[in-house]
Regions:
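Single conserved hydrophobic/aromatic residue that forms the stacking wall/gate
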Residues: 334-345
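Conserved, single-site charged/polar hotspot
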Residues: 2-336
């Protein structure tokens, strides 16, 4: 079918769908709307029907751009309805996340790490667009603010994978990641945290997996992306009270305190995030003076892909980006063309 014929057909379908939608707009005020699915964060996913959305994108052409409901832009803060060139978008966010790692690992390893990060970013953005959630956890660095050597190297990686997303059972996944995973003192294994243990929601592709290069690469990644991986805390962040006692004995593969198992000063916490910021891997102990304290390791929620771990896999084992992604995002998972390419084919 010619491009002109395709667009004519799409236009006719769009008109039909619009005519069907008009009566619904004048429905009685008390009419119930469809509930829609929800994300892990509880966002309602009642959206334009996929057929209509795809039809309009096919008709008018999405090209190589991506539009996000919300996005943090470096130096500009949180912006709404941001439209960017897809490749520039992935280059800018990948740089924010991983920086110039090519200065610290081999070019081949850096390329695979950047590719893995870019595919995870693209999947995350598409997931949150699809389900009506804001993707404002990400920060886009405008490409003209990225040093030219880093920009060129990252663009070389991104250009080869910009049309790939991650799917599980046919749907794009919420490809979350964090700077590092943790260490389980009980098993002696470094690994990630499952979605169930971190947030109380069992997600098939967010399971605990081993991630052996955390300790080896955390100092490197701290220099690259400027995040602290170790610190000591003397007060409970939720109450501001000094620690007197705590129980952190129930841990998952990654050494993260499990869902609904932390007790501090006699109080049980249902969600770990209610009392610390974003660091969830810790042990209760005492400092050299005998003062009770929390020793934290890692940065981030520890769920999904570990940035320290994936850089380690690329450098130490020569692992390619697809194998890295399959390792961290379990389930029957594969990479595929983005919805944008399917519509344009």
């Amino acid at each position: 079918m010619s491009k002109f014929a395709r667009r004519c057909a799409a236009l006719m379908l769009a008109v039909v769908l619009l005519c069907m939608a008009v009566p619904a707009a004048f429905a009685a005020e008390g009419d119930a709307l469809p509930a829609g699915a929800t994300t892990m964060g509880g966002a309602n996913t009642t959206l334009i029907p996929d057929e209509e959305e795809n039809c309009l994108s096919w008709l008018f052409g999405s090209g190589d751009t991506i539009t996000m409901p919300y996005l943090n832009v470096k130096g500009q803060g949180l912006r709404r309805n941001v439209t960017l060139d897809l490749e520039d978008c992935l280059v800018g966010i990948t740089y924010t996340e991983l920086g110039s790692i090519g200065s610290y690992v081999s070019d081949a390893a850096a390329q695979q790490a950047w590719k893995a990060q870019a595919v995870a970013i693209h999947s995350y953005l598409e997931y949150h667009k699809k389900y009506g959630s804001s993707a404002n956890a990400l920060v886009y660095t405008p490409v003209d603010q990225i040093p030219s050597s880093a920009r060129s190297a990252i663009r070389r990686a991104v250009s080869e994978v910009k049309d790939e997303v991650l799917t599980c059972n046919g749907s794009v996944i919420d490809a979350v990641w964090s700077a590092s995973a943790g260490y389980n003192t009980q098993t002696g294994v470094y690994g990630t945290c499952s979605g169930l243990d971190a947030w109380g929601t069992d997600v098939p592709y967010l399971q605990s997996v081993e991630s052996p290069y955390e300790e080896q690469y955390h100092n490197l990644m701290r220099r690259v992306i400027g995040k602290d991986y170790r610190y000591i805390e003397y007060n409970d962040s939720k109450t501001g009270q000094p620690y007197e006692s705590a129980d952190t004995t129930h841990k998952d593969l990654g050494g993260f305190v499990q869902y609904n198992t932390f007790v501090s000063n006699g109080k049980s916490y249902r969600y770990i995030g209610q009392f610390v910021s974003s660091r969830y891997c810790f042990d209760f102990s005492a400092d050299e003076n005998g003062t009770p304290c929390m020793n934290y390791y890692g940065f981030g929620h520890g769920v999904g892909m570990s940035q320290c771990g994936m850089v380690g896999y690329a450098q130490e084992q020569g692992m390619g980006y697809r194998d890295i992604l399959r390792h961290y995002y379990t389930c029957l998972l594969y990479t595929s063309p983005s919805p944008r390419d399917v519509e344009e084919s």
